[in-house]
Amino acid sequence: MSRVTLSRYLIEQTRSNNTPADLRFLIEVVARACKEISHHVSKGALGGVLGSMGTENVQGEVQKKLDVISNDILLEANEWGGHLAGMASEEMDNAYQIPGKYPKGAYLLVFDPLDGSSNIDVNVSVGTIFSVLRCPNQYLSQNESLNEAAFLQPGTEQVAAGYAIYGPQTMLILTLGNGVKGFTLDRELGSFVLTHENIRVPETTAEFAINMSNQRHWEAPVQRYVGELLAGETGPLKKNYNMRWIASMVADVHRILTRGGLFMYPRDAREPSKPGKLRLMYEANPMSFIIEQAGGASTNGYDRILDIKPESLHQRVSVILGSKEEVERVTAYHKE
């Protein structure tokens, strides 16, 4: 039986689910960009791409060389094809409008070009996260200037989302709103090949991912929930749990997507004015869309992540996502 490449899968989606041709093209362009990023990541010190740039992004985080390289790759790959009206990235202060010399398309692309880049120098899995939105009609005119407001749509408006994970294998995880598929990069063939047909998150779990060093700063509901996990068989949950923490959202969520579990990056008392650490638009929303499409759930503790109306491009949010039963439990604790 012949293998199904990403291109073939997307063509079949166009035939069976009326996936628009320009959306299909957009996903293929992003996938090609991810292949190029994977190449740079895999070269490491041999390619002179390790270390920092000595600059900070809009988040106040030190930019790694590969952050900037990955951002440039995604911009250059997507700006000319006529499928986008604009882009936004963790590494750019403002929205990026497609240059006037290129045709303008109907979609917006939002991305974290290299999630987990603090792990690059120690050779831990990193990845690219992306989200696709429709551009509001008022910005589709070739003469209309695009601004941040065009992107401020709740996660329920996403038409596609995915991530590439650069680890022992390079994989692309994708949802078009009808389930979650996994594609593995065949380097000999040069294509992403469908290897995971229908990814589902188990409803129950015995694993969780959280940075325990921040425990003293957490709010009471999270303190309670994690305390119950750690109590094991003798505690109220009557089950032993294992903790895993990679400090790369892509890597942690990928493990939960394939093995079940709960990923938590809750707000804490260190910066009470900030509702969380992770960014809503290009981290929490795409990952929540994927997790929900795989049968899981996602919340900020009180509300479904995908229902949150963004107020700014780089808005932060508390994130708790993964196996549905566990998400519902910790949400109930927040509401007591």
Swiss-Prot record:
Q: Name one GO cellular component term.
A: cytosol
Metal-binding among the record's keywords? yes
- Record EC number: 3.1.3.11
Which residues take part in binding Mg(2+) 1?
Answer: E90, D112, L114
| One Pfam family from the record | FBPase
One of the record's GO molecular function terms:
magnesium ion binding
Q: Where can this protein be found?
A: Cytoplasm
Q: Which InterPro entries match?
A: FBPase_C_dom (IPR044015), FBPase_class-1 (IPR000146), FBPase_N (IPR033391), FBPtase (IPR028343)
Q: Which residues bind Mg(2+) 2?
A: D112, D115, E283
Secreted in keyword set: no
Catalytic activity annotation:
beta-D-fructose 1,6-bisphosphate + H2O = beta-D-fructose 6-phosphate + phosphate
> Which keywords does this chain's UniProt record carry?
Carbohydrate metabolism, Cytoplasm, Hydrolase, Magnesium, Metal-binding
Its UniProt pathway annotation is: Carbohydrate biosynthesis; gluconeogenesis
Q: How is the cofactor bound?
A: Binds 2 magnesium ions per subunit.
Q: Which cofactor does it need?
A: Mg(2+)
GO BP annotations of the record are: fructose 1,6-bisphosphate metabolic process; fructose 6-phosphate metabolic process; fructose metabolic process; gluconeogenesis; sucrose biosynthetic process
**Residues bound to substrate:** D115, G116, S117, S118, N211, K277
Protein family: Belongs to the FBPase class 1 family.
Q: How does it assemble?
A: Homotetramer.
Q: Which NCBIfam families match?
A: PRK09293.1-1 (NF006778), PRK09293.1-3 (NF006779), PRK09293.1-4 (NF006780)
The name on file for this protein is Fructose-1,6-bisphosphatase class 1
In its UniProt entry, the species of origin is given as Pseudomonas entomophila (strain L48)
